[in-house]
């Protein structure tokens, strides 16, 4: 099977989908080698998608669908994703948090590497909880609903990816994506 992404993706976004694909293929209990996974980016405008800041969101959505586990609906997230499962920094985090708050989201997952970049306006302080993460297993732990299922999925992912959480290592240096 293959991962097919549509919606006017630029080069960086296409690479991001490939990283997500690698994590999903490592992660899933199911044999997905004979399944095609379609990812459609909607409302991308004429410029399309040029960045990797939706990587953790795409990975969470696909894993949720494959494993039939719901995603919390009061949550927004942004972050790039390495093939090892590390959540990498992205640009524009403050703006994204404020937009999520305006849209009614109660929690926002961001890369831990971006935590010091956050300078949200006072009016948004009490509207959202900002949750910094460094690994996809942390994203899934927060985002997926159903405690027993989530615990099992997160434990499995930590085993498969050799989680930075277990060995104490941190993602290597990376420059934020433009999105």
Residue ranges and their predicted role:
Residues 1-179:
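Peripheral, non-AAA+ core regions of ATP-driven protein-machinery
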């Amino acid at each position: 099977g293959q991962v097919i992404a549509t919606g006017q993706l630029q080069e960086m976004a296409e690479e991001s989908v490939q990283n997500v694909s690698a994590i999903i293929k490592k992660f899933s209990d199911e044999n997905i080698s004979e399944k095609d996974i379609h990812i459609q980016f909607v409302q991308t405008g004429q410029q399309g998608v040029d960045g990797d800041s939706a990587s953790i969101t795409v990975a969470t959505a696909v894993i949720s669908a494959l494993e039939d586990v719901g995603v919390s609906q009061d949550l927004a997230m942004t972050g790039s994703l390495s093939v090892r499962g590390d959540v990498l920094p992205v640009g524009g985090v403050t703006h994204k948090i404020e937009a999520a708050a305006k849209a009614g989201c109660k929690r926002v997952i961001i890369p831990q590497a971006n935590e010091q970049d956050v300078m949200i306006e006072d009016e948004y302080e009490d509207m959202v909880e900002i949750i910094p993460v460094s690994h996809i297993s942390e994203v899934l732990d927060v985002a997926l609903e159903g405690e027993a299922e989530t615990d099992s999925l997160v434990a499995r992912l930590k085993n498969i990816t050799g989680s930075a959480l277990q060995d104490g290592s941190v993602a290597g240096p990376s420059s934020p994506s433009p999105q």
